[in-house]
Amino acid sequence: MAPSGPTGAQPSPAEPLSRSIFRKFLLMLCSLLTSLYVFYCLAERCPPGSGPVAGVPGRGVPAGPRELAMWPAGAPRKRLLQLRQRRRRGRSGPGDSSDQEEQSPGLAAAPGGSGAGSSVAEAQPGTLALLLDEGSKQLPQAIIIGVKKGGTRALLEFLRVHPDVRAVGAEPHFFDRSYHKGLAWYRDLMPRTLEGQITMEKTPSYFVTREAPARISAMSKDTKLIVVVRDPVTRAISDYTQTLSKRPDIPSFESLTFRNRSAGLIDTSWSAIQIGLYAKHLEPWLRHFPLGQMLFVSGERLVSDPAGELRRVQDFLGLKRIITDKHFYFNQTKGFPCLKKAEGSGKPHCLGKTKGRAHPTIAREVLRQLRDFYRPFNRKFYQMTGRDFGWDG
């Protein structure tokens, strides 16, 4: 019998045809893998700024419709950006604050957050940079402007689940405390966003800051404003409870509430009381923004029906309704809805340990007098916003 030929030669009549096909397939596969490996090695050696790359902003040729169509959808893009941010953070030294990941004060141990003073890390050189837009920092298109202890932190954390929302975790306090630093400084606080994503921030004190409406309007008259409001009586008690946890030696709630207890005069100079005068604080905002550019979210419904309120918010922001009932579960211990999966994490997360903190017991007569005091302000607020929040029922 004649000896067999070398590998890849024509099969002998006795050799099955399938074995020959399989052998050729293996050769082609090995060649393909070798070529891909060589291409990958060469790409990794190329410096990030070696030349214009189509479709990558800041690297030459701007992205066109063809490149945009090839980019991943919103959610995968957001996860990839967060992954690159965490990797870059691991390599950064302690003094490199520009690459530090923001830590939201509200969501305990929630990885992948985004907030003040941070930036998404630059794309690593190589093939990923050809497919991913690294994004850019933008001034916020939407701001949660109030109110303190109304549920602003919960709303922001819920919104950050949406793949098209990028938000600062910490409160920037730009329009009330740091306006002198300029818009460039403010923009640098923002996270990077991709095409189709919106930038957000929340600072509840803006709502009661006299200069804030004009300053935000000067930045952009198209800014969308969200106000989370809550029964002013329970809001005041919650405000006091937070202060009490930091300063246990402060006077009682009752003594701070009244300017003259025997006459029943409420002390409106106390910030816990003054913030609840929503109608008064809303007036300057309506001089700079149309009512249709503002959304008033019920803090009570954010607890009882978070998906319903988030549906309104998503519609207001022009976002696809992605956040639904399936994203929430009710924590019986805290008496508050929690996220089944927080941003950048596959694990359930509730807001921080202060959420659901027990309030001190307030005398019924004090509560009655406070409700009587707030009633005319509440009714005016209902008329101004076109929504009855039911605080006087």
Swiss-Prot record:
Family: Belongs to the sulfotransferase 1 family.
Enzyme Commission designation: 2.8.2.23
Gene Ontology terms: cellular component: Golgi membrane
Cytoplasmic face of the membrane: 1-24
Keyword Transferase on entry: yes
Name the UniProt record assigns to this protein: Heparan sulfate glucosamine 3-O-sulfotransferase 3A1
Pfam families per record: Sulfotransfer_1
Its job: Sulfotransferase that utilizes 3'-phospho-5'-adenylyl sulfate (PAPS) to catalyze the transfer of a sulfo group to an N-unsubstituted glucosamine linked to a 2-O-sulfo iduronic acid unit on heparan sulfate. Catalyzes the O-sulfation of glucosamine in IdoUA2S-GlcNS and also in IdoUA2S-GlcNH2. Unlike HS3ST1/3-OST-1, does not convert non-anticoagulant heparan sulfate to anticoagulant heparan sulfate.
Chain sites annotated for binding 3'-phosphoadenylyl sulfate: K149, G150, G151, T152, R153, R230, S238, K355, G356, R357, A358, H359
